Amino acid sequence: MYVVSTKQMLNNARRGGYAVPAFNIHNLETMQVVVETAASMHAPVIIAGTPGTFTHAGTENLMALVSAMAKQYHHPLAIHLDHHTKFDDIAQKVRSGVRSVMIDASHLPFAQNISRVKEVVDFCHRFDVSVEAELGQLGGQEDDVQVNEADAFYTNPVQAREFAEATGIDSLAVAIGTAHGMYASAPALDFSRLENIRQWVNLPLVLHGASGLSTKDIQQTIKLGICKINVATELKNAFSQALKNYLTEYPEATDPRDYLQSAKSAMRDVVSKVIADCGCEGRA
């Protein structure tokens, strides 16, 4: 069985003191680079997709592609719903074979966040599907979820325990100063808050908004309990910039099989660096 749940992946990471990277994929080339690089480095990875990605590719198509590539490379993969907000949408994808879900109700008041998340957890656990939820909000935009910086807030450690116990989630995404998108300057991460959250919450912790973070910051968050690192914008930027550069240099290029190679090479550098930063090479 090559398409797996994230639950065992993250529990292994927690015990082993490393993190599993979750790469948001946007097209076939992104998927190829992530899987090929992970297989070559014998690293566990999570294939993540926002609602927009599943709409773009088609849920059945995406599931079939993940399954085929996992078998081709003899490498276990998890496919994960990132920042999904609608119960019916999640339920449909779970019934299609998805075994890892992030329900994002972090924009709701605390009690409503608990209620919405618990509804999803109760459904998903019937299918042995692991569930991640977020307490606190990151600034920036992820797919169609946008949070103004002024509205972003950090995770409260005491509330985090209540939230985890009331919902029954399998992992908790925390807000400690990261944001979706790339950073104009290095963010000031609240490491002491993260350490407190780890003391209050007995679950694998997840860091969103990791694109552009320094190796030092990533590794420090892992030491303090982060077991899953999300990367999206960094891959998109590498792909887009390499493609622009190639077509500027070779404006007559017309064959995507040729000009997409530069974009894949740029993404490969990102994926291999993130895997190294997470300390998960050789852990698959």
Swiss-Prot record:
Described function: Catalytic subunit of the tagatose-1,6-bisphosphate aldolase GatYZ, which catalyzes the reversible aldol condensation of dihydroxyacetone phosphate (DHAP or glycerone-phosphate) with glyceraldehyde 3-phosphate (G3P) to produce tagatose 1,6-bisphosphate (TBP). Requires GatZ subunit for full activity and stability. Is involved in the catabolism of galactitol.
Family, as annotated: Belongs to the class II fructose-bisphosphate aldolase family. TagBP aldolase GatY subfamily.
Residues given in the record as Zn(2+) binding sites: 83, 180, 208
Gene: gatY
Catalytically driven reaction(s): D-tagatofuranose 1,6-bisphosphate = D-glyceraldehyde 3-phosphate + dihydroxyacetone phosphate
GO biological process, any: galactitol catabolic process
Residues engaged in binding dihydroxyacetone phosphate: 181, 209-211, 230-233
Entry-linked Pfam families: F_bP_aldolase
KW Transmembrane (keyword) present: no
UniProt GO molecular function: tagatose-bisphosphate aldolase activity; zinc ion binding
Cofactor annotation: Zn(2+)
Pathway recorded for this protein: Carbohydrate metabolism; D-tagatose 6-phosphate degradation; D-glyceraldehyde 3-phosphate and glycerone phosphate from D-tagatose 6-phosphate: step 2/2
Active site: 82
Gene Ontology cellular-component terms listed: cytosol
Keywords for this protein: Galactitol metabolism, Lyase, Metal-binding, Zinc
Top-level division of the source organism's lineage: Bacteria
Complexes and interactors: Forms a complex with GatZ.
Keyword DNA-binding: no
SUPFAM superfamilies the UniProt entry points to: Aldolase
CDD domains with a match to the protein in the record: TBP_aldolase_IIB
EC number(s) per entry: 4.1.2.40
Free-text cofactor note: Binds 1 zinc ion per subunit.
Name listed for the protein in its UniProt record: D-tagatose-1,6-bisphosphate aldolase subunit GatY
